C-alpha cells in the first residue's frame, strides 16, 4: 500500500504498447490531493477470490491513513480530513478515458476533461 501526496496535477495513465491501448484517469487535485496505490497479489483466501486475484488499484483520495480501521481517527486528529459543514455541498467528478497509444513512447499529460496528450516519438 502506498499513498502519493504533493501531487501537482491529478491524473495517471497506464499503457499497453503490445495492444496499442491505454487507460487514463483525471481528477481535480484540489479535491483529491492523494493517490492511493494498492495491489492484491493472490492474498485473499476467501470468497470470491480464493487466492486467484491479481489486481492493482489507483484511487484518488481526499486524505490518507496509515493505521487501517483506526485510520479515520488518525486522519481527523492530524487535520487531514475533508470537512463539509451542514448543508454544504461538493460536486466533483473523475474522468476515465481509453485511448490509442499510436506508437507513442508514453503520455505527457491527461487534461481535466480527459484528453490524453502523448509524448512525441523520437526516431
PLM features: what roles do these ranges have?
Residues 82-100:
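Short Pro-Gly-centered flexible turn/kink motifs
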Amino acid at each position: 500500500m502506498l499513498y502519493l501526496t504533493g501531487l501537482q496535477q491529478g491524473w495517471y495513465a497506464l499503457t499497453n504498447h503490445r495492444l496499442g491501448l491505454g487507460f487514463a484517469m483525471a481528477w481535480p487535485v484540489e479535491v483529491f490531493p492523494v493517490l492511493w496505490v494498492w495491489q492484491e497479489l493472490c492474498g485473499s483466501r476467501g470468497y470470491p477470490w480464493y487466492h486467484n486475484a491479481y489486481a492493482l488499484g489507483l484511487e484518488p483520495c481526499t486524505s490518507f491513513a496509515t493505521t487501517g480501521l483506526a485510520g479515520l481517527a488518525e486522519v481527523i486528529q492530524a487535520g487531514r480530513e475533508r470537512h463539509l459543514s451542514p448543508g454544504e455541498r461538493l460536486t466533483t467528478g473523475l474522468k476515465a478515458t481509453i485511448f490509442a497509444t499510436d506508437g507513442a513512447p508514453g503520455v505527457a499529460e491527461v487534461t481535466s476533461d480527459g484528453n490524453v496528450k502523448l509524448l512525441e516519438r523520437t526516431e
